């Protein structure tokens, strides 16, 4: 009985435990359900609030373009340490020194380089009476610019941020060259106080070397015929000039009578153009300028002491003036570039070699682009460098014996391809050991050998170009003459089918575009200017093909449209080349710029520069025609 009661007691306890456990499970389930409900409500509220703040877009940027390099997640500890210590302070960004003086110096130097001096070159080519006044204004602004630089230097703290820089020296030299050039111009420019009525026009005598627009003049037979690419001069009242013009007219009439009535009008016009070419490139003294409108110049030119000084020094002054006119234009930009480098603290220490290598080479291609566009506009047409047909007579070479290009000209003349080949050969010869300057005293690395191999290419292609010019000498002479004439001693069709200058530019672009750099950013920029140079050389070869298939038969500039594209590629390629220095790349990477950012800016700047250069040539042509009709 007792055992039965014990068993019942155990069953009762077990039932109690089961009931308690079920109650606990129910409580736990209820708690869990309540927690899940709370979590669901919370997450729903969070989702609603976050969705309300999101702006829907089709795509979100997932690349690092435009992101400053310090925000890049892929930097190594060594790279992050370098960029955290990167210093962006320069002469341009600091507030030390007289900032107004520095800004004035920068603005005036840019004004001289891009506006005043180029405009003065156009006035000089047009023999305008405003040339000397503008040259004087140019000199005054240059003096004030150098003085402003001196003020900034004296007000800057004692610490020297760029030790042993040469910008101060180059600025002083610029001022000296400006002074010498101005006084040489004052002494060498012929001035006459005679009236306009004393000038008589002489047909088909060139006004200058830069004129490129064909004009209609009265030919010897009394009918209008197209002249060369240059307008007529107004002769001095001298028996020599008048006699020369008279003899030329008689010779043309005699040749016209011998041709007979069966000669077609087309052949007659071509013969007249050929005879006119002799007169067009004939040597003649530049016409005297009319009295200056500015009183100080009128008083100066009538002064007895000035006339005596000019009589003794005019020859020397004339040589100095012509030697400085265009080189001074290039030196202004050299000074400007050096100032940009010093102002941004570029090229300090061993980095000077990387800077010079890129800026010298890039500057050469940029200059070549400027010259190519000028040739398209008619620059140096008297030498046949404007893609124009030209012939030199024995009388011309005698009267221009002081000009070495006329005096020593071979039968095919000195072409622009000859000049380019010589410069390529010279640059390659001097550049062999320059590539090792950064590692002077150490072993030659693979990078040094890779660079010096390009110098070897320059030597080889430059020499091949010179030899090709020698072989094509007779070919140019025969293809330039319109008909046989005994007194023609040199002639050129305006080009030489010499592929080596274009070949050199093409392979320079290809080799450097594939040259591995320290970063992908730098490699991309090298690829950009490498391809641009290659494209430019391709269009230069198309120019040769066009002129070979459709030769230019007169002395007017042929203006092949392919040269416009060539000029753009050389200008833009040279500018991007100069931007690809190590320090320039680092400055752009630090600020998060992309390679296309600088490329876009370069394309826009070059387009504006080309437009400005063409405007200057068109304006110069208009000045020449206006001056001709006013005298």
From Swiss-Prot:
Residues 220-239 have a biased composition (Polar residues). It is a multi-pass membrane protein. It comes from the Eukaryota. Residues 127-131, 192-322, 373-407, 473-529, 620-631 are cytoplasmic. The modification Phosphoserine is found at residue 219. Residues 1-20 form the signal peptide. InterPro entries: DUF2427, YTP1_C. GO terms for biological process: regulation of cell size. Keywords: Glycoprotein, Isopeptide bond, Membrane, Phosphoprotein, Signal, Transmembrane, Transmembrane helix, Ubl conjugation. Residues 216-274 are annotated as: Disordered. GO terms for cellular component: cytoplasm; membrane. This is Uncharacterized membrane protein YCR061W. It comes from Saccharomyces cerevisiae (strain ATCC 204508 / S288c) (Baker's yeast).
């Amino acid at each position: 009985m007792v055992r039965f009661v014990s068993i019942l007691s155990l069953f009762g306890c077990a039932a109690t435990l089961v009931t308690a456990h079920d109650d606990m499970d129910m409580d736990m389930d209820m708690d869990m359900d309540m927690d899940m409900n709370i979590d669901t409500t919370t997450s729903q509220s969070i989702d609603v609030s976050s969705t309300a703040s999101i702006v829907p877009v089709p795509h979100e940027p997932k690349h690092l373009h435009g992101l400053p390099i310090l925000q890049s997640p892929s930097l190594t500890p060594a790279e992050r340490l370098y960029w955290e210590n990167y210093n962006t302070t320069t002469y341009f960004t600091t507030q030390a020194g007289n900032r107004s003086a520095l800004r004035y110096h920068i603005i005036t130097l840019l004004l001289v380089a891009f506006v005043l001096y180029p405009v003065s070159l156009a006035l000089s080519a047009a023999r305008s009476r405003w040339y000397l006044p503008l040259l004087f204004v140019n000199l005054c602004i240059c003096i004030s610019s150098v003085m402003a630089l001196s003020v900034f230097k004296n007000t800057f703290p004692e610490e020297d941020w760029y030790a042993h820089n040469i910008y101060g020296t180059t600025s002083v030299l610029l001022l000296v060259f400006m002074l010498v050039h101005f006084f040489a111009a004052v002494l060498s420019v012929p001035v006459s106080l005679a009236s306009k009525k004393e000038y008589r026009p002489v047909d088909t005598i060139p006004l200058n070397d830069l004129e490129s627009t064909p004009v209609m003049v009265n030919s010897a037979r009394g009918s209008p015929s197209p002249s060369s690419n240059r307008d007529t001069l107004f002769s001095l009242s001298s028996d020599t000039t008048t006699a020369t013009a008279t003899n030329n007219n008689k010779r043309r009439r005699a040749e016209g009578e011998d041709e007979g009535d069966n000669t077609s009008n087309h052949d007659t016009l071509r013969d007249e153009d050929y005879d006119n070419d002799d007169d067009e490139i004939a040597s003649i003294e530049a016409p005297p300028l009319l009295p200056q409108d500015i009183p100080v110049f009128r008083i100066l030119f009538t002064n007895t002491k000035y006339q005596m000084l000019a009589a003794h020094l005019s020859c020397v002054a004339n040589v100095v003036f012509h030697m400085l006119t265009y080189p001074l234009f290039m030196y202004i930009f050299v000074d400007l570039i050096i100032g940009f480098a010093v102002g941004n603290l570029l090229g300090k220490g061993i980095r000077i070699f990387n800077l010079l290598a890129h800026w010298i080479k890039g500057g050469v291609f940029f200059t070549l682009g400027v010259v190519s566009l000028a040739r398209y506009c008619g620059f140096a047409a008297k030498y046949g460098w404007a893609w124009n047909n030209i012939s030199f007579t024995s009388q011309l070479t005698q009267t221009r014996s002081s000009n070495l290009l006329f005096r020593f000209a071979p039968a095919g003349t000195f072409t622009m391809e000859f000049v380019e080949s010589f410069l390529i050969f010279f640059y390659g010869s001097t550049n062999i050991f320059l590539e090792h300057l950064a590692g002077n005293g150490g072993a030659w690395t693979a990078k040094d050998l890779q660079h010096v191999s390009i110098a070897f290419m320059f030597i080889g292609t430059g020499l091949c170009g010179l030899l090709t010019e020698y072989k094509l000498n007779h070919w140019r002479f025969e293809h330039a003459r319109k008909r046989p004439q005994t007194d023609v001693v040199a002639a050129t069709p305006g080009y030489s089918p010499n592929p080596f200058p274009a070949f050199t530019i093409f392979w320079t672009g290809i080799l450097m575009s594939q040259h591995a750099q320290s970063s992908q950013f730098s490699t991309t920029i090298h690829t950009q200017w490498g391809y641009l140079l290659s494209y430019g050389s391709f269009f230069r070869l198309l120019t040769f093909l066009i002129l070979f298939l459709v030769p230019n038969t007169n002395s007017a500039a042929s203006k092949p449209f392919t040269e416009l594209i060539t000029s753009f590629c050389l200008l833009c390629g040279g500018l991007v080349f100069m931007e690809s220095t190590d320090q320039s790349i680092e400055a752009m990477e630090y600020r998060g710029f992309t390679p296309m950012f600088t490329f876009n800016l370069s394309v826009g700047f070059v387009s504006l520069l080309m437009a400005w250069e063409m405007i200057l040539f068109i304006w110069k042509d208009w000045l020449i025609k206006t001056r001709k009709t006013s005298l």
